[in-house]
Amino acid sequence: MNRDHFLKEGRRFLLSILLLLAFQGAVAAVISDMSVELTTDKARYNPGQTVQLTATGNIPQNTMVRYRHGATVVEEQPFHSLAQDNKWSWTPPAIDFRGYLVELYHKVGSDEVILGTIAVDVSSDWKRFPRYGFVADFNNYSGTVDKDANIRTEMAYLNRLHINGVQFQDWHWKHHQPVKFESNGTPSQWYQDISKRYIGTRYIKKYIDVQHSYGMKSIFYNLCYGAWEDAVSDGVKKEWGLFKRDNSGNYVQDCHELKDWASDIYLQVPGNSDWQEYMKARNEEVYTNYKFDGFQIDQLGDRGTLYDYNHNTVYLPDGFTSFINAMKASRPEKSLIMNAVHDYGAERIARTGNVDFCYNEVWGGNGHEQFSHLYDVIRNNDRYGDHQLQTVFAAYMNYDKAFEGGSGDKLMNTPGVLLTDAVMFALGGAHIEMGDHMLCREYFPAASLAMTDELKTAMIRYYDFMTAYQNLLRGISSKAASSLKVETTAGNVTVSAWPPRANAIVSFSKNVENHQVVHLLNFRGTSDLSWRDVNGTRTKPTLTENLPLTVTTNRTINKVWAATPDNIGGAVQELAFTQQNGKVSFTVPSLQYWTMVVLESENIEEQLLMTGEAVQRDGYGAYDLHQAVPLKRSDDGLTFTVTTHLKGNKYFKFTNGTDWATCTSFNAEYSGYKFNNSNRSTTVNLLINGSNDYKFMVDADGDYDVIVDLSQLRLKVVKAGESQVKVVLPDELPQETISIFDLRGRAVSCEQYLNGTLPRGIYILKQNGMSRKIIIR
């Protein structure tokens, strides 16, 4: 044998060793039993609060309790040494805004058999991960119904779904007079709402008390501009009204007609300060007599051209902003949520900074009917709220089937509901759908369609999944959405990147720190790409098992795992994988509606490079990635920094590698974003592989400190030597001339403002009698 042969064989041997090292060996099988039901005592826990758990079912002697955050095992204990009468407690780590999955399992040989799972949410504020439900029936029907028992049963189920906020729909008397009083000034025990339904005050209060015992928030509903026909007799002025012009050109008050109900709804100018003062007083009566935690504000969408009493044109979204701010100023400690019907006013609502999250009532026929439109809503909301607000959809399933009392089997269609929830949850949204029934119409009391037991159980699994993995699903906004290339060698399966495609598996990916998360959404067997399933005819997607996948990434992957709400209660399934030449290969055990695959690496990014015509290296703009400027990675891997020369008014961006075929870009949120050194506004969002390849600029040539925070996807660029300045607003004001307050009216240190250490948020700055809103990002 000659020398070349030995070299060739040596290279082949070395390659085989490398491949062997790259292969992550077989892992234990995870088997579904799910015969044990688990419950917790609350829907949400504050950091440091103890969780009380109960198991119901046959529990083998060798059963273990395991607590996971993602795939990481936080704690593990033998069940029978821990539990008394199948009840036990657990105190999670005192870390805020975290989701956990509790797994009950036992081993059979080397395999793990999952007996039951349940999620735990540790969050000091519900708005970080809102899971919104509703109630809409407050009647005992003349004693024929044990309403107290029903309330306990309904709220126990919502607690099992980890619903942490509940909207009270159509609970009030008149829209302009929500609390009805007797002649002696005490609240009426019974009254009729606008649809002439009977409402029992004690049942409203009972719901609130039970919800509070579960750690839920109770939110009352009302329009921002609604009044009954007799409102003038209750102190509402005609001059506050909202007017339209009829076919003859006459000005008539706009109203929402409700045939055969107690009254039509006559609309007021929401921005009218006298109307706002009137409603503040009415809301104070609400808060005085009921322990509500906030106000769900409603509207009726775009009403066309509108006028005030003096025939001035009214732009409703401006009025929404004014109304929200007035309600917040009146009761700053209370939650506010406002409906963006058909997306109307969504941007103005979110930009107030005074709503807990974005709430979008979406419909067909207005650009929101397709699955793809759901992501558009989330992405837009993220931008409007500076990536600080979550999105909750009001989206009514099986709408036509539910018309006028329902048709056919009068059941919610399980495949339609589950595929829509799978998409919404995978994209980072939530869905208000669960209450004393499942929503199918915009009139919440309408319970036209019932849920099957199969659907009720599936909802538990889906809400467990959304809660347990909330940090991966909703921990960072759509700016972290990436474009990972996902391929399969299965000949009869098509894998397509978002947006949805008929008869394909669709992948949606997101980078969450050192996790690359790939959501597989199953559209096999369907050509209907509308989320609505209006007639309840959607069938189950084609079950796909043992699906071979390859993901292209230039991260070094050290673990791959999968989880699905459709199997094994969402438990983690670690997957064997190989990695070679930037491609990670593994097999997904099953995909029914939705499976999440997570690729974990040691670091968020192993390198980061600055590229573009603004970057000067060897005299040339660094479009050639080998000419790009490398940034220095911090010890914790969360930030990258560099001081470099940049040309003014020329573009730059960031990449995580030197091969355009495999690297990821980090872009600007808006086209041609320019860092303005005259006002030194320095910190902005980064987007991963944005739909548009937007880049950044500086306004003048010079040396700049560049700091990239990958954990928050924020970019900071300042003139070299000024990087200690976090945010400085346009005017350099002497300390003694200004005062600053938060939105609750509490004074804030001027020194914090001047040295750039104010926390992110919205503040009111007052100078020489003038006030303005400032945003610290």
Predicted regions and their residues:
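Active-site-adjacent "subsite" loops/lids of carbohydrate-active enzymes
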Residues: 126-147, 220, 224-290
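Aromatic-rich carbohydrate-binding modules that target alpha-glucans
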Residues: 604-647, 657-680
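Mature N-terminal, pre-catalytic/accessory segment of carbohydrate-active enzymes
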Residues: 17, 28-164, 168, 523-526, ...
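C-terminal outer-membrane/trafficking sorting elements
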Residues: 722-777
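Carbohydrate-binding surface patches
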Residues: 492-555, 592-595
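C-terminal beta-strand-rich structural cap/linker in extracellular carbohydrate-active enzymes
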Residues: 580-603, 704-716
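Active-site neighborhood of glycoside hydrolase catalytic domains
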Residues: 271-357, 363-376, 385
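Aromatic/acidic polysaccharide-binding cleft in carbohydrate-active enzymes
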Residues: 389-477
